[in-house]
């Protein structure tokens, strides 16, 4: 609700800004040669510019809670530079990345003997004190001439180990800046969330679940683009910060070289010892010095252009933030209307006493209580952001007043900052858990309402099914009785049929009857033929007898 609903804008706007920020190459390139030390007038102009930047950042912080990181930008960079200067080669930690050592000018290398890397003793303490004075002058509190400060040579091991510790410190500070920026955005978002009026309670219903799915998808895309943009900006910030610290260290180194050269030159002139080689190299050194001054002027112009461009981008991002806040407020009102509608439906399904008016009053009380709690939470978060800003301000004041005990105080401060970060993370986790629980409660209310309706419907359906089952069982019992009687009648009819079949013989059997008739006809015909044959046989026998008689009579007349 807090983190997801704030980023409802389409990914096109910020995606383009992120690409423009990421695609715009940094104009400041790492120079292969050593940069020249600035003039005292330029050192005086730098604190004035930084003071103007701090005033602009304070005005932006009064308008919103997103400029806390810009207020702490200059003090944190100075702290990183101090830490880089104080860390020695024997400090425990991760192995330092190999950084290119600034090449010493040939003239200075010829004049100055090589100093030992270790065993400096009081000279290192003197160098640290001088570095702190230079940083105070950069903040606008003390403006001193840098050419007259006797600084010792920066050791090669110290210069190699400083960037790694500085990178770790910058990462911790960037995490704090992200927390401050996130808390400021949450306070503005919650201030916009607490403003919906009660007149929106009877608002129009939402478009449906598809709109929320599209909104969640756009929020995820928005978060991914913001994370990518933030990572690109952090990488650019780290690289520029490391380059600036290297330039500052090498600036101190060159100022020390110039001081040593001037001191030796004055000593030789006092002793009236002519140094022809130094006189021959003086024009070359002067040309190199002027060339490096021109390079420094170009770098300052580039820095001013980059600063102006970043201010323009900051204005665009603020405008986008205002648009997002307006959309968040609109979505919050829609969510309140939807929540009221859902609660009214849930209470209507539960059939509360008092009817719709009682349910409406109870819903208004719940929403008013929730609105009050949201306002209290936004006020507490705003107070937390203000306290963090005041804490950053007090930290910057304390850093300027610290002395050699800065290391112990810095360790304590880092521990407290880590604890504060863990507490802030726990608070964010609790807020996320609270949001998840609220969503679960809403989903549970909807599920319970749906289950109650379904249970009531199933009860009525079960009663109807039971009635139908009783009727069907009665019909089955009646059918069983009828079936028993039918079987008994069937058995009686079967016995009667067998008895009648036995009595009737061929009755009803057409084929047998027809065959019987045919057989009877044939027998009659055969009997008639037999009678005719018998009569014919009798006639033949009579005729034979007559013939035989005639033959006998004939034989009797014949002579023997």
From Swiss-Prot:
Keywords: Cell projection, Coiled coil, Cytoplasm, Cytoskeleton. It is found in: Cell projection, Cilium; Cytoplasm, Cytoskeleton, Microtubule organizing center, Centrosome. It comes from the Eukaryota. Pfam families: CCDC113_CCDC96_CC. Residues 1-12, 127-144, 179-209 have a biased composition (Basic and acidic residues). Residues 357-481, 510-536 form a coiled coil. The keyword Oxidoreductase does not apply. Residues 41-61, 101-110 have a biased composition (Acidic residues). Residues 1-209 are annotated as: Disordered. GO terms for cellular component: axoneme; centrosome; ciliary basal body. GO terms for biological process: cilium assembly. Forms a complex with CFAP263; the interaction is required for functional activity in cilia. Belongs to the CFAP184 family. In complex with CFAP263, acts as a regulator of ciliary beating that connects radial spoke 3 (RS3) to the inner dynein arm (IDA) and the nexin-dynein regulatory complex (N-DRC). The complex is positioned parallel to N-DRC and forms a connection between the arch at the base of RS3, the IDA tail and N-DRC. This is Cilia- and flagella-associated protein 184. It comes from Macaca fascicularis.
